[in-house]
Swiss-Prot record:
Family according to the record: Belongs to the krueppel C2H2-type zinc-finger protein family.
Alphabetized GO MF terms: DNA binding; zinc ion binding
Species of origin: Manduca sexta
Chain's role: Krueppel is a gap class segmentation protein.
Protein's UniProt keywords contain Zinc: yes
Name of protein: Protein krueppel
Keywords, sorted A to Z: Developmental protein, DNA-binding, Gap protein, Metal-binding, Nucleus, Repeat, Zinc, Zinc-finger
Pfam families (alphabetical): zf-C2H2
Localization per record: Nucleus
GO cellular component terms given for this protein: nucleus
Biological process terms in GO annotation: regulation of gene expression; segmentation
Main location: nucleus
PROSITE patterns associated with the record: ZINC_FINGER_C2H2_1 (PS00028), ZINC_FINGER_C2H2_2 (PS50157)
Keyword Nucleus: yes
């Protein structure tokens, strides 16, 4: 947590030299360079680098619309 305050980013990408505060952020970032997409949609052929992107994509198949407009009944 201290790195948030100090700005220290000890983990550097060997490809593009972008720096990260946490080693797992670097690991996820490296997938952009390798093309690895370990998270697969069980409903279609799409694959994702980050699990959060898979979770967001799954709403396409479930029809879930978790966000509501404050001014009308529309959901997104």
């Amino acid at each position: 947590h201290e790195r948030t305050h100090t700005g220290e980013k000890p983990f550097e990408c060997s490809e593009c030299h972008k720096r990260f505060t946490r080693d797992h952020h670097l690991k996820t970032h490296l997938r952009l360079h390798t093309g690895e997409k370990p998270y697969s949609c069980p409903h279609c052929p799409r694959h994702f680098v980050q699990v959060a992107n898979l979770r967001r994509h799954l709403r396409v198949h479930t029809g879930e619309r978790p966000y509501a407009c404050a001014r009308c009944p529309a959901r997104f």
